[in-house]
């Protein structure tokens, strides 16, 4: 499966993809009578993706390049990822909670696994 970030395609396996719909309010306040009053900004589609361990040298190179992009000090990126139904979804996002785990370290190479990232949408998918 592929993922596209800022027009660059990365051929990496996706082992899990969790999509959330987060509602953001301009304000939300509960009055003394217990009623919630709110002004909804919109619904943001955010994703958490876990990438699998590479199975060949090309995937290993793509995973290393993906790590560098995910850890750049850049405010926003254009990403295209499959949504929960496998349909390509393109949106502007920032990256959060980027992490990977050490699989094996040798004198010649370091091998990583379980690269995980959260894509947080810049703007809402749906608005009132």
Where does each model-flagged region fall?
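Extracellular/virion structural assembly segments
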Residues: 1-128
């Amino acid at each position: 499966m592929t993922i596209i970030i800022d027009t660059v395609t990365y051929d990496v396996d996706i082992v899990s993809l969790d999509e959330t719909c987060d509602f953001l309010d301009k304000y939300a306040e509960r009055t003394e009578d217990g009623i919630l009053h709110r002004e909804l900004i919109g619904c943001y589609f955010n994703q958490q993706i876990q990438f699998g361990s590479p199975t060949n040298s090309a995937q290993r190179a793509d995973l290393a390049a993906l790590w560098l992009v995910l850890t750049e000090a850049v405010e926003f990126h254009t990403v295209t990822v499959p949504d929960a139904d496998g349909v390509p979804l393109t949106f502007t996002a920032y990256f959060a909670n980027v992490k990977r785990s050490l699989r094996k370290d040798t004198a010649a190479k370091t091998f990583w696994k379980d690269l995980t990232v959260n894509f947080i949408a810049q703007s809402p998918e749906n608005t009132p």
